[in-house]
Amino acid sequence: MTAAPHILLVNPWIHDFAAYDFWAKPLGLLLLAALLRQHGCTVSYVDCLDRFHPRTPATDPQRRCGRGPYLKTRLPKPAALPDVPRRFSRYGIKPEWLREDLWSLPRPDLILVTSMMTYWYSGVQETISVLRDIFSDVPLILGGIYATLCREHARRNSGADRVVGGAAEAVLLDLVADVTGFSPAARFDPQDLDTYPHPAHDLQHRISCVPLLTAKGCPFACAYCAAKKLNPDRMTRSPEGVVDEISRWHRDFGVRDFVFYDDALLAQTEHHAVPLFERVIRHGLKIRFHTPNALHIRWITPAVARLMKRAGFETVRLGLETAGPSRWLEQEQKVTADEFQRAADSLKQAGFAKRQIGAYLLAGLPGQSFEEIATSIQIVKDNGVTPILAHYSPIPHTDLWPAAVTASRYDLAADPIFTNNAILPCRKDSFCWGTITRLKTLLAD
């Protein structure tokens, strides 16, 4: 058999008007790194978003529960967005640091680059350009969310040799064999999450938090969400496996902050979330849980809220979307004001403070009125919960995409840069700071 290859995995820069590390880690890429190590490969990891790079000022990784600002470098604004009066930046380490890090590595046999938001693709392009300068003859494969949702655009514009959509772990060993000739027998089952190794968080310079995925896929099919496209099949892990992972990172690396990346953590509550929370409680782990992806409100009962509190939940985010009528939310999935109140009351009675509970409200949907958003904000505040606006970003392959294309002042299908939620892409008129200011005033009142 061909000798085990050296594979470089890279998390690219972000190019955007604004970006902040709200527990953002390239979980999929770090899982691939773990799988490659499990099968005998040598792996190297470079994170262009590394807030703890050796060249940055020392920062406590546990500050802000693992969150924090990225290093920022001003860039020219994209020529396609002249109507947006905001500064555009590269977020992440300096280019010269990246080049130094790459020069210090042995030549890899294969490079794997991930991607996140579709409208961050210029950051992917710049990252790949630097990789090409250093390792011009090394095969480079691009995967991730942008590669999945905008595959043809990525093929034409990213600079990668190959673009892979969907769950890369299912085809990882075949890709490695095809490029390098190294073909070990699989030591995991892509359809059984309990056979996967723990993601290789130890490759990071510092571990500020550990993202957890207790299940893949979502039982819902919301019109604005791409979860079904990204992970069409629902697969769950055993509570024992999840707690073993938590215990390892807490015990061996001192990690306190754990972040659920699940699309539907509370789905099948009695068979999945409840046993998990109970096992965490029995282990007596002094840790903090955060739910930036939002919890489904209907599944939060007084009993579930009490378990969450005892298990160590610190940051609770609820997926309200809108408290008013909406043609974009299926009626059976729409949460009523009464259901929201019951969930909020359950959390508060369990001991959660107002600062710990936030409700996401979608803003900027096609045809959505300012009054609808204002009504939703007031309902959230009336229930003693913090409203958090989630500005809508149009996503290809979702049911809402055609309406977004019709509503936008941009040609969304022509360039993913136009789907950036920071530019309010579904307004027919030009970008307006007044709308943002009015919404911020409502949130603050």
Please annotate each region the language model reported:
Residues 2-255:
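Acidic, low-complexity intrinsically disordered segments
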Residues 8-14, 19, 24, 46-56, ...:
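C-terminal accessory regions of radical SAM enzymes
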Residues 47-52, 229, 264, 319, ...:
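Residue-level recognition of beta-strand->loop/alpha-helix junctions
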Residues 112, 164, 259, 317, ...:
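Conserved beta-strand positions in the central sheet of alpha/beta enzyme cores
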Residues 117, 146, 264-266, 295-297, ...:
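Active-site-proximal loop/turn and secondary-structure-junction residues that shape catalytic pockets
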Residues 151-158, 304, 366-381:
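Catalytic cores of alpha/beta
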Residues 159-160, 309-315, 383-386:
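Glycine-enriched alpha-helix->loop->beta-strand junction motifs that scaffold or abut catalytic
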Residues 194-354, 358, 378:
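Radical SAM [4Fe-4S] cluster-binding motif and immediate context
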